[in-house]
Amino acid sequence: MAEMDLVAELPRPAGAARWAEVMARFAARLGEQGRRVVLITSGGTKVPLEARAVRFLDNFSSGRRGAASAEVFLAAGYGVLFLYRARSAFPYAHRFPPQAWLSALRPSGPAQSGKLSLEAEENALPGFAAALQSYQEAAAAGTFLAVEFTTLADYLHLLQAAALALSPLGSSAMFYLAAAVSDFYIPVSEMPEHKIHSSGGPLQITMKMVPKMLSPLVKDWAPKAFVVSFKLETDPDIIISRARNALEVYQHQVVVANILESIKSFVIIVTKDSETELLLSEEEVAKGLVIEEKIVDDLRSRHTAFICDKN
C-alpha cells in the first residue's frame, strides 16, 4: 500500500517511540474511565527541499479551528489528544496573543522564594482567568494531551502512533482531522543533500503526491473509530460533490465542508445520506460564539448514534 510505504520511507522523528507510549497510556487510562477520546489534528505540515534542510514548502494553517474545537470537546467531557503544528494556535492560549500579555501584565511586587507574582486589569485580558482555569482543570484531570509536529514526516509517524493508541477504544474514539497536510513531497532518495543555491539559475522541482492517510486510518489503524475529515473549497458549486466523493472513496463517517469566504461562520456537515448546514447568526457572532461550538455539538450527537449502532 502506497500510504504505508510512504510512512516507512520518511524519517522517524526523534522521540516518536516515547510519544507513542505516552499516547497509548493516555488513551488506555481514559478508556478505563469510560470516557470518549477525540484525536484533533491541527495546523499545517511542511516538507523539506533538501536533506540538510534550509528551504521548505509549507502548508499554512493558523490552527484556530482545531484549537477552538479542542476547548469545546473538553468542556463536553471528551479526552482530547491534540496533535498540532508547533507554534500554531493552542487551546485557550490562542485567544491571547503574547503582545497582549506584555501590555496587560504587571509585576505585583518583588519576587520572593523564586515565585513571581503578576497582576492585570480584568478588562485588559477579558476571559483570561476563565481560560486559564479551564486549561488547568483539564491538565489536572489528565484529559488533555498535546503533541507537536512540524514536518510531514513528523505528522505521518505521529498520526499512525496516535491512531494505534486510540484503536483499542473502538467506537468511543473519534478522529477530527483538521490539519492542513501537504499534498506533495520530495522522496528522500531524490532530495539534494545540501542547500540549493540560487547561482544555479531558476529552480525546477519535481514532487510526488502524498497519498491520503484516511485510507489506512479507516481500514487498518483504527477501523472501529468515528472519523471526521475536512474539505475546504473556494467554489461552492463543487463542495458537496467533493465531500461525497471523499466519503465514497474512504468510507468514513463525516466530512465537514467549508467555503473559504465563510469558514468562520458557515459549514456543511456531510454524511452518506444527509447534508446539514450550520450557520452563525449575526446575534451569535455578537455574543462571541464560534462556529466550532455548533460543529462539535453536531458531531457529538452523531458520535453517540454511531456508538449505539455499533453496540
Swiss-Prot record:
Origin species: Mus musculus
Family the UniProt entry places it in: Belongs to the PPC synthetase family.
Pathway field: Cofactor biosynthesis; coenzyme A biosynthesis; CoA from (R)-pantothenate: step 2/5
GO biological process terms held by the UniProt record: acetyl-CoA biosynthetic process; coenzyme A biosynthetic process; heart process
Molecular function as annotated in GO: ATP binding; phosphopantothenate--cysteine ligase activity; protein homodimerization activity
Listed PANTHER family: CORNICHON-RELATED
Enzyme Commission designation: 6.3.2.51
Keyword Cell membrane recorded: no
Function: Catalyzes the second step in the biosynthesis of coenzyme A from vitamin B5, where cysteine is conjugated to 4'-phosphopantothenate to form 4-phosphopantothenoylcysteine. Has a preference for ATP over CTP as a cosubstrate.
Reactions mediated catalytically: (R)-4'-phosphopantothenate + L-cysteine + ATP = N-[(R)-4-phosphopantothenoyl]-L-cysteine + AMP + diphosphate + H(+); (R)-4'-phosphopantothenate + L-cysteine + CTP = N-[(R)-4-phosphopantothenoyl]-L-cysteine + CMP + diphosphate + H(+)
Residue numbers carrying N-acetylalanine: 2
Keyword Ligase attached: yes
Gene: Ppcs
InterPro entries for this protein: CoaB-like_sf, DNA/pantothenate-metab_flavo_C
Protein name (record): Phosphopantothenate--cysteine ligase
Assembly description: Homodimer.
